[in-house]
Amino acid sequence: MKIKLYIPTCDKYNWLIQPFAYTFNKFWSEDIEVVYLGYTNPNFELPNNFKFVSLGKNDSLENWSTDLRNYFNSINDEWLMMTVDDSMLTSRTDSKLYDLALDYLQKTDRKIGRFGLERDLVTREHQHWDTHKGFNLVEAKNEATHRISMRWSIWIREYLVKHFVQGMTPWTFEEDGTINSKGDGWGIISYSKTNPPKPPDNSVVFNTNALWRNWFRDYGRFNIMDCAHEDPFKKIDDETIDEMKKLNYFPQGIEFGSIYNKKWYKVRV
């Protein structure tokens, strides 16, 4: 099974496509098709495995879920990946774990809505779900927060579309979706190293960073630290940062740094 990665975005963050694409192809593969779902087409060339689809006019944020629901209802993919536009790869992808996830989804007869691929689900309440080829799988408990999440995940399209209710923003998609997902009969799962699991204990497919945002304000900051890794102090290597700077992938005046205990620390790179 081969699936595509979909990334919702907006005009304000079109500039993130270039550093995202660079780290994606460096730390994973140029054979995976990536589809950006945005509004105004970017004014730069995309790598061969990247595609930009315009959803129309970049207007009210409340149209976010409606635009995505309409798009995903128009395609035939049974399974797909999705993530946010400001969470890029920071080190090599565990391709073996990724392939095993696809293998499990093809072979199991259990209902799975979302398969988390990074250090996310396992940091909250979870329990044993299954074992597949030597790897433990855990599911989010009903009381867990962020059962519905925009973090790197594989989704069955039917379940994803169900949660794109009209008038939702990315934040209410996660908040309301989590409430609506409780007891709905769909598994929300991820990898685990130990059984019974003790957080944080998972094996992750992707190690990622996240741009520093505070509610609806953008501080023009780029987090170089890995926020979804077993080692929270691991950062994107200097060589990769230097390569992207030479290619002018960052806007003038962008600040580089790290986040610790919800505080921003500027660093020189």
Regions found by a protein language model. Name each.
Residues M1, A228-V269:
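Membrane-proximal basic amphipathic "stem/tether" segments
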Residues M1-S60, S65, N70-W79:
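N-terminal anchoring/stem segment of glycosyltransferases
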Residues Q18-A21, E62-R69, D94-D103, P170-T178:
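Well-ordered, non-membrane alpha-helical segments in soluble/globular domains
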Residues V35-L37, L80-M82, G113-E118, I154, ...:
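A structural signal for short, well-ordered beta-strand segments and their strand-loop junctions
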Residues E78-M88:
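Short beta-strand-to-loop acidic/aromatic patch adjacent to the donor-nucleotide binding site
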Residues S91-T123:
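Conserved donor-nucleotide/metal-binding helix-loop-beta segment in metal-dependent transferases, i.e.
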Residues H128-T145:
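Short, flexible, basic/aromatic active-site loop/helix in glycosyltransferases
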Residues R147-A228, P232:
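Catalytic core and acceptor-binding pocket of nucleotide-sugar-dependent glycosyltransferases
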